[in-house]
């Protein structure tokens, strides 16, 4: 045993020293990388001249205002090559730099210009966010190097890359109500967004099957609403496993996630889904419903008939209290208020709700006005479109038509149609060894084909299409690997929809670039569907 421990220590020392010998002591050859990355930049102009070689003499030059971005790049390179490239603020002679800067010459706030040459790399962004997206391009380009042996270094060809995103809203959604995921996994998921140049994390944290965020003024939401007595087994089943299930995020944990995302230029948009999808809240406080209960936290999937009572003044006090605490945690200008799948039967039979015309529109306006008074904007699913205030933002999920209608009416719109963007749907036709899933079949080609702002819209309407996102509803995603598997690589296809101009897109070319990118995903320990690469699959068994 002692001899084994000594051997392990020696191996550990060798691993620790290997990057140093690799970059400093050995006579090295070099392997050139490329810029065939995803999402594809808007312009890549290869230049004459020698490539840039990443060796131990390179330093990262950045002003104090970009210290966070410089340290992120340092961390990425450390993970890739095992060296800590120094971050400095002053230039020295005979040193090659990766230089980060914000420049007024880059007119797009999220845009950047990356200049690569033998003497160094210069990355100029329109803001710190633009610099950050340039760093993503840099790290993915280095990842494409794929050294053939330990005696090779990382190189990039001389080039000038000029880039800026097509859309300002580039998002991913994660449902943490149906199934609860750890803080560490949420952070890993946010890292995945950053890798894809995404800037919005839509966090679904309340629903019928569980209330997942601490609200101090209404403690039963955690004591009762965050736990259910069991969970339906399989798809289209009425069999309950009778195993208690629950969990919630403390406000401190939520703030930690918000800060983690902000460091990656990602805004966390929380969703408090109402007035439907509120059974967990009703189980906690039955007086908020039309019948007064009793209610039980949902344990099967689908739509429940019990909703918040729009004729009860206490409901609006509840909503304002919840949103006040939510706004204190989440600095996002946009707060998602749900509004989808709200049955009206209970309202129609409720004495308190009589006399209120257009009941859902009445509720939506009350919530909208409250958020507006606090300097925030309300975003809801496309059901809120009819009767909603002009400044309400619409998330179009029932196809693209509601989004087109909303945009033509002057609403700001995010396209997230089930036809293209519901990544909990199956992605391969042969489902024998696939996980359970909701809905139908959305192959990666379908995701890639989405145009959120087609020419069929008027010029004015296209200006109201802020962007697009994909949604991951977690009814059948019982663990973290399943979330990643359902997301990838379709999420990567959507990233190119969000970022790259349509005339630059080509699916066959994308598939070639995707093949290399997925190897980097493996290196970063993400699980993905390998159906496009049969040689990577293990036959006749689960693929994750």
Model-found features: residue ranges?
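Bacterial N-terminal signal peptides
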Residues: 15-27
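Flexible loop/turn segments at secondary-structure boundaries
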Residues: 68-69, 180-182, 208-214, 275-281, ...
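Short, conserved helix/loop micro-motifs enriched in His/Cys and acidic residues
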Residues: 170-173, 238-239, 341-354, 389
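Short glycine/serine/threonine/alanine-rich loop segments
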Residues: 83, 198, 264-266, 376, ...
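Substrate-binding groove of N-acetylhexosamine-processing glycoside hydrolases
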Residues: 38-40, 46-47, 54, 256, ...
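Feature activates predominantly on carbohydrate-active enzymes
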Residues: 107-306, 310-317, 322-334, 366, ...
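Contiguous, structured surface segment used for ligand recognition
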Residues: 32-167, 482, 497-525, 529
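Bacterial N-terminal signal peptides that target proteins for export
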Residues: 2-18
């Amino acid at each position: 045993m002692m001899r084994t421990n000594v051997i392990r220590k020696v191996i550990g020392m060798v691993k620790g020293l290997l990057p140093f010998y690799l970059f400093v002591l050995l006579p090295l050859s070099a392997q050139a990388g490329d810029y065939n990355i995803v999402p594809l930049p808007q312009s890549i102009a290869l230049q004459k001249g020698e490539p840039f070689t990443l060796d131990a003499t390179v330093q990262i030059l950045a002003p104090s205002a970009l210290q966070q971005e410089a340290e992120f790049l340092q961390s990425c390179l450390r993970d890739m090559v095992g060296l800590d490239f120094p971050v400095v603020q002053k230039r020295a002679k005979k040193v090659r730099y990766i230089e980060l800067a914000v420049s007024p010459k880059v007119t797009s706030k999220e845009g950047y210009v990356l200049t690569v040459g033998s003497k160094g790399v210069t990355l100029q962004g329109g803001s710190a966010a633009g610099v950050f997206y340039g760093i993503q391009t840099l790290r993915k380009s280095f990842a494409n190097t794929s050294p053939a042996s330990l005696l090779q270094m990382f190189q990039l060809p001389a080039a000038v890359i000029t880039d800026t995103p097509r859309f300002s809203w580039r998002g991913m959604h994660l449902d943490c109500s149906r199934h609860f995921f750890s803080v560490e996994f949420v952070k890993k998921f946010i890292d995945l967004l950053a890798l894809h140049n995404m800037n919005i994390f839509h966090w679904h944290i309340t629903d019928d099957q569980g209330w997942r965020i601490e609200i101090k003024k209404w403690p039963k939401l955690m004591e009762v609403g965050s736990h259910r007595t069991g969970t339906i087994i399989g798809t289209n089943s009425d069999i309950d496993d009778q195993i208690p299930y629950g969990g919630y995020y403390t406000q401190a944990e939520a703030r930690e996630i918000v800060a983690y995302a902000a460091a990656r230029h990602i805004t966390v948009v929380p969703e408090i889904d109402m007035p439907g999808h509120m059974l967990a809240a009703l189980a906690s406080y039955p007086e908020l419903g039309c019948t007064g209960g009793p209610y039980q936290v949902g344990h099967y999937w689908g739509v429940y008939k019990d909703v918040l009572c729009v004729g009860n003044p206490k409901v609006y006090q509840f909503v304002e209290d919840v949103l006040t605490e939510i706004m204190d945690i989440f600095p996002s200008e946009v707060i998602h208020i749900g509004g989808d799948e709200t049955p009206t039967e209970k309202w129609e039979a409720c004495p308190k709700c009589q006399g209120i015309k257009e009941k859902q529109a009445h509720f939506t306006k009350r919530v909208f006005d409250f958020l507006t008074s606090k300097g925030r904007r309300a975003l809801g699913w496309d059901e809120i479109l009819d009767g909603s205030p002009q400044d309400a933002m619409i998330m179009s999920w029932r196809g693209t038509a509601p989004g087109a209608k909303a945009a033509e009416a002057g609403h700001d719109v995010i396209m997230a149609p089930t036809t293209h963007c519901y990544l909990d749907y199956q992605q391969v036709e042969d489902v024998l060894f696939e996980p359970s899933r909701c809905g139908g079949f959305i192959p990666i080609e379908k995701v890639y084909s989405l145009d959120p702002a087609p020419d069929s819209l008027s010029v004015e309407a296209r200006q109201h299409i802020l962007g697009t996102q994909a949604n991951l509803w977690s009814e059948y995603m019982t663990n973290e690997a399943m979330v990643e598997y359902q997301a990838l690589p379709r999420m990567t296809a959507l990233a190119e929809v969000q970022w790259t101009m349509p005339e630059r897109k080509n699916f066959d070319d994308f598939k070639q670039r995707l093949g290399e990118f997925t190897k980097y995903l493996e290196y970063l320990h993400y699980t993905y569907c390998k159906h496009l690469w049969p040689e990577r699959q293990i036959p006749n068994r689960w693929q994750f």
